[in-house]
């Protein structure tokens, strides 16, 4: 794949050893940093390298700890704050100071908390159905609503429930979950997502960011209660047709087109 390199980074975050698998492309412009959602991987975003709308645009994507090809020596330490610190460590290792931010679902929440901590580094933010309110925990709240005896049992049942979901691409997503997530990574991440969504004042954090912002969502989720608030506060909305929570699977052409159009408006 032209221009894309794959590397592994040995990092230590909060005393925990990590091996982080990355995919990246260099260039002179400010890079895009992609943070994938739960049950996804960096490969969701590598097709950017084929898209003429991103010609010359560098990017960095990586598998979160406990996901994809990345490993974590203590999965019990995983949480959204831990993923934020991981993102900081990856950026430092890559020598990236300022960047455009794109995050999906879990990655969108991680991206929001990262942008909140370092707003001057974030040139723009595309939030693809990242958590902003309690209603966004339709996946993560299952750790509370569907109690299981152990991590493996919960994960097996979660995969089966997801497979039968009526939302577009859910079965496709479920088919690879066991290959992309370690069961021991689930509880800490899900509990953290629920806590922040319920009590983290995420909407205020998102609306207060100084950078240009887009909120992307699938047409099956066009009933999200806060969409009018986002539009009224100057956030660009991008509804992806024929899609639910996973536009990168259901309608990637439309997703990439909207991302490219948004970035064409940015000066760097």
Language-model segment annotations:
Residues 185-239, 248:
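Conserved serine/cysteine hydrolase catalytic core
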Residues 44-46, 70-76, 136-139, 227:
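Conserved catalytic-core motifs of eukaryotic protein kinase domains, centered on the activation segment
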Residues 15-16, 54-55, 60-102, 106, ...:
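Active-site loop/oxyanion-hole signature of alpha/beta-hydrolase fold enzymes
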Residues 1-19:
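N-terminal cap/lid segment of alpha/beta-hydrolase-fold proteins
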Residues 137-138, 152-208:
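Conserved alpha/beta-hydrolase catalytic His-Asp/Glu region
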Residues 112-116, 122-154:
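Flexible "cap/lid" loop of the alpha/beta hydrolase fold
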Residues 235-268:
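Catalytic active-site module of serine/aspartate enzymes centered on a nucleophile-bearing elbow/loop
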